[in-house]
Structures are given as C-alpha cells and as structure tokens.
C-alpha cells in the first residue's frame, strides 16, 4: 500500500492531496506517515553514500560537526514551511480550502521533493569516487532547486485547479515565493544551529 501511495503521489501530487482533503482517505496514505517514510529512506541513503560526512582533521571539528548533524535532522522538514507559506499567500481564498487542508498539501508535496532527493542520491551508490561526490555536491543543489520548484508549481496547478492561461502568473508568483521562502528559512535555521553549537562548545 505504501508503494502504491508513493507512486500515485509522484504521478499527481496535487490530485492526490485534493482527494485526501475531500474525504477519500481510505485509499490514501496519511501525509505525516508518508513524510516520515520518505525522510527515513533519505537518511538511510545519505548515510550509505556518506554524502554529509566531510573530511575533518581535528577532534574539535569532528565534535562540532556531530552537533551540527544532530540539529540538522529537522532541516529535512523545512521545505514544508516554504510550500505552505507560498500556497497561503497566493491561493489561500481559492476553492474554500482551509489552513489545515493546505498544510496537508504542503506535506504531500514535500514528500515528493524528498522522493526526488532519494532518486538523486541513487547514482552515488554505484559511483563512489571522491571526485564524483564532490561534483554532485556542487551541482545538485541547483538542479534539485529547479526540479523541486517545478514540482511545487505542478502540484499547485492540480490542487487549486489553475486551468486558465490568464492565471498562470499566480503559479509563477507562487514558485518565486517558494524559492524565496525556502532560502530564507534555510538561512535562519542554519544561523540558529551555528549559534546553538557555538554556545554548547563554549565558543
């Protein structure tokens, strides 16, 4: 059932979320359960590929990284905030959806984005050379950023039924707001993590 739900969600994230909020929940996996499944799979894969493990010379640097990694576990959910904010700002009054239903949409979309990250990591299970990993770390954030924005816009179009060409600007605006909100949330979270780690280490 989980595999079927993931496949249906990937094919039509907005339609999947719309069916859920309109009451067809027996055939849909709960958004939180699906999100936790995706995050768990991504964490396991990142550990296998050693994607987030840098080469650190000193013991102090290793301790600092361990603390940063511990706090960064919550960062996998930051995209939900950006998706939710952009949807509320642009489409909040459309079709009568309430805040909770739009939050469910945001969780489902974020689950698809994480599924895309999982696919993006799979080649590193085969090509493990350090130069390949370095190249992947350099370019992946850009390609994934574009792909995730397209997923968000595609899902918004389905969920909010944006079918008229004269309304396309709303999708473009929502995509731009998503990019800005995601960048802002990540910057704030990163700064908060650094400050907490510095405080714990007495720096």
Q: Whereabouts are the PLM-identified features?
A:
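Membrane-proximal intrinsically disordered regions of secretory-pathway and membrane-system proteins
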Residues: 1-203
């Amino acid at each position: 059932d989980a595999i079927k739900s993931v496949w249906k969600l990937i094919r039509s994230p907005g339609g999947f979320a719309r069916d859920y909020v309109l009451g067809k929940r027996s055939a849909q996996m709960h958004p939180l359960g699906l999100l936790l499944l995706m995050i768990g799979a991504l964490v396991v894969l990142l550990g296998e590929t050693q994607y987030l493990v840098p080469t650190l010379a000193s013991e102090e640097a290793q301790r600092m990284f361990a603390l940063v990694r511990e706090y960064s576990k919550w960062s996998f959910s930051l995209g939900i905030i950006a998706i939710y904010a952009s949807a509320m700002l642009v489409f909040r009054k459309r079709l009568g959806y309430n805040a909770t239903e739009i939050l469910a949409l945001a969780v489902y979309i974020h689950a698809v984005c994480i599924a895309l990250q999982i696919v993006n990591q799979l080649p590193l299970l085969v090509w493990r050379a350090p130069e390949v990993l370095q190249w992947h770390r350099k370019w992946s954030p850009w390609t994934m950023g574009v792909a995730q924005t397209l997923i968000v816009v595609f899902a918004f179009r389905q969920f909010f039924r944006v079918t008229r060409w004269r309304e396309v600007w709303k999708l473009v605006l929502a995509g731009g707001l998503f990019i800005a909100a995601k960048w802002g949330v990540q910057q704030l979270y990163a700064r908060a993590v650094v400050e907490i780690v510095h405080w714990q280490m007495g720096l």
